[in-house]
Amino acid sequence: MLARQGRRLTREHRLLLALWARLLEPWQGGAVPFGAVLARAGQRPVEERVRLGSGWQRQLDGALENLAAALERDQPAAIVDDRRKCTLCSWHGLCGEEAARAGHLGDVSGIGGKRRQMLQDLGIDRLEQLAEQDPEDLARQLGEHGDQHRDVAPMLVQQARVQRRGQPRRLADGPALPELEDAAGVLLYDIESDPDRREDFLHGFLRLPRSPDGRWCPEAASYHPLLLRADLGEDRHWRRLEGFLDRYGTWPILHYGETEAIALQRLARRQGVPPAAEQALRARMIDVHARLRTHWLLPVPSYGLKSVAGWLDFRWRQAGVEGARALLWWRLWNDARAPAAGRRLLLRRILTYNQDDCRATWAVAAWLLQGAAQRAPDPAPTGGSTNPAVLESCSSTAGPEPAP
């Protein structure tokens, strides 16, 4: 029996069940044809039966043979292409360093396992080789696999060249965030979600006013978390959220990625917000990630917030924390049997992580506002940044805000 946290049953889940079934066979004196998976539908647990046929046993054989061969070698096995599932692994940082040192193609933004194989079939095995390619020739060759691969080829070459040089490259002229030129302030917005329950349990805002002389001063920012409590209901939660947004009705809402905009608009729609008000809310929302991708190429393996803000030397106060860990803390916090002191600590950690995500979003936005310095500055202490794009507009250096 396996407890599944995500929405879908993955190949890894099935292989693990197949392994357990094989280990149980001699103890039970017979084959184990099925596995059980427990998941959650709302507040109710549900069970799914999984057939463990011969096909999965063959795949398990192959996986075990590959593992045995890797353990016999003197050198470590090749780094996997997709390391997004490795964020909680203690080896994650070391693997990333090795991939960067070796020029692993999987470390070029836009290259997954399938596209990497296409490039290797063309004799392109490393970032250096990709950077040397003629964009038009590569587009023609990848075009045999479809228009999508042909169209992205020139950008892959440019991205590889930027990563090889270690310097950003501007793609589009003009300001990346013109909406902020006359804004009295901005709201930095980040949500934390539970995908199993399909709920956004925390809407976090960093309120950043502008000084009378037009400077942006992050040290004047204040954090406003709106926690979804099941006992209050979504309608009351929306009224609190709507009241906060209306208080700063002319301020742009900056977020990193499309998740926040989609979630907020869906919530407004479920609460019966008139179309005109929904359109006004949509017009206030600015996706910093989309603006960054339109205007710049960066020497980063990923354009996720952690990667980009880290390149700008922003540091989260809780090292190594990802959204998955914040979700785990949330689920533990919801356990009423947990000691009160432990629950307070969990909530504090969740809010600190969310606040730092908001602050990291501002670090990227501030870099864009400056027209972007041509390199990342020296490392900053945890929770802060020495990036001049973040602090240069204020007379004093902003240190880390206290945890909420």
Predicted regions and their residues:
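Conserved DEDDh/DEDDy metal-dependent 3′-5′ exonuclease domain
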Residues: 1-70, 220-327
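Long, low-complexity intrinsically disordered regions
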Residues: 8-118, 122, 127, 139, ...
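Acidic, Mg2+-coordinating catalytic module of metal-dependent nucleases/exonucleases
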Residues: 40, 47-102, 308-380
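Short, intrinsically disordered C-terminal tails of secreted or membrane-associated proteins
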Residues: 400-403
